[in-house]
Amino acid sequence: MATPMTAAQVVAQLKKWGLHHVEIPGWATHNRAGHGAWGPVNGLIWHHTGADVTDAKAYAAGTLYNGLADLPGPLCHFSIGTDGAVYLVGWGRANHAGGGDPAVLAHVVNEDYAGQMHPTRGNLNGVDGNSHFYGVEIQYSGSHEMTAAQYVAARRLSAAVLDFHGWSEKSVIGHGEWSSDKWDPGYAAGKIMAMPVVRADVKATRAAGPTASVPTPPSTSEETGMKLSDAVTVGPWVKAQWPDDVGLQDGAVSVNTALGSTYGHARAAHEGVDALRAEVVDLRAALAKLTQLLTKGA
């Protein structure tokens, strides 16, 4: 059990763990205060939104912030767009977990379970999860896998939360492990992800620490700053394939060499193909003559 992070603390954690985040206006004080407890907190629940979203910020600022006709917002604390951006939607009690299995809650509190959890209670007959869990809504339908960028961000977000509270990966669960009514986060229609695998990945992410490299999107600029004299790494198979090539033993070649070699080999391959085509034409002509002679002789 733990006191929930403050809004300032969660922003600091996101920055510490290298997560690109977007603050929806008003998020820090937007919550369901007066409609139930908030804290002590025990974990983080992964959700899918149930729909593929084209405008992540608009969805976070609209549906997730305001809620639905029968379920007022905020509907989560965090949301993750397809590009891996983390949106801060609300802070405090949020309508995301609903009712769930008290046995699952006990396991999360004690971090004493193994494998996938299978709840026997749901929203109507379970205990209040909104007071105990942070919630992240990952913006995808659940009928297919989330994007790679979303999975990276969700793991790092989880690690950031665990890092602050000193929890293990067993404080991260899927909504479908909390409530018998749910199956998120999904990878196919009606099928929850293998959460033990997710937890293992979260554990590895946390162990790697906040300074571990984070995949970044490719530059959209034509200017990359790379010089022709800069070195580029070659795969280990290259050295294994040509062990006597001294220039490859340091595992790198210059951009100029790489480009020149690529052009040279491509040119040689092109000329080789042209030569083979010419030989095939000659062979076909010779075969036609031979066939004609054999036919006459018969």
Pin down the residues of each PLM region.
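Eukaryotic intrinsically disordered, low-complexity regions
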Residues: 89, 219-222, 241, 257
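N-terminal catalytic cores of peptidoglycan-degrading enzymes
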Residues: 1-129
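Residues in flexible loops and secondary-structure boundaries
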Residues: 54, 94-97, 144, 180, ...
